[in-house]
Amino acid sequence: DETLEDLFDELTFEISEEKKQNCVKHIRYILGYQNFSGSSRIKTKDGRPWSRETFMDEIGIKVCPYCNRQYITSYSVSPEGKRIRKTTTDTAHYYPVSKFPFLSMNIHNMVPSCQICNSRLKLDKVSCKSDAHLYPYMDPSSSLEFQIPFSDVPQLYAFSEEDIHICLKGSEGVEKRAEQSKKIFRLEEVYETHRDIVYRLKNEIRDYSREEYNKIFCENYTDLFGGYDRFIEVLHPFLAEDEKNTPLTKMKKDIYFYLKENCAVLY
């Protein structure tokens, strides 16, 4: 027996590409996507235009959830005294509008992202379930973990910045989608740019995990910081930062805790 998907494939096979694209345009127009991305005539309950900028304000994140490298923010401009909201954000459709036009205005299909991840890397690559990458609304950020493989403690202390290789590992149960995210968004490749940050973190771990530093702190600075845990947060401010609002926080936290778990040299 033919499945609904098989029947749909047979149906669309008879439709020319030009007609399919015209159909997509009409569906997007009916659903109001052009207004959403431009000057929206649809209003929210409090009277604001329902637009990409409003959606971004409601989501309330400042960093791209796909890469955690780029800020995505909204701002206001006032030409001729009229306040207008703008945004640096792309509205990435998890399932692309070109293939799933009926999902163009479904907020569960709209993911705020940076232009690099959406317009240069993702594009229309997710066309079916087997292509699916991690879904930010359901998959936690821990679905992908940054690591820097090394064999022993002396190697950790000895490696140079050029030796650093940043890799990502998918967590159990989401390995396939995690691998797709790595592939689509080129995460391991683009994060090679940040080897200097990992190298600096490694040096801080090496320098401040020594017993003599712990002793000096306990004897002289406990009152200043209110405790050793607070001292660690001052030394590594990313530990107290929210990765939804600060770029590169996920990489820093993952590497820090990876070293803490795999190497008995941390504080």
Language model: regions and residue ranges:
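Histidine-centered nuclease catalytic patch
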Residues: 69-109, 123-128, 133-137
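Extended, Lys/Arg-enriched charged tracts that mediate electrostatic binding to polyanionic substrates
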Residues: 59-65, 72-74
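Short, flexible, mixed-charge glycine/proline-rich loop motifs
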Residues: 23-27, 50-60, 101-107
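Domain-level detector of nuclease and nuclease-like folds
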Residues: 120-183
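Short cysteine-rich clusters marking metal-coordination/redox-active sites
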Residues: 64-67, 114-117
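N-terminal accessory alpha/beta regions
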Residues: 1-44
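C-terminal, charged low-complexity interaction regions
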Residues: 160-267
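Short Cys/His-rich Zn2+-coordinating modules
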Residues: 30-52, 92-99
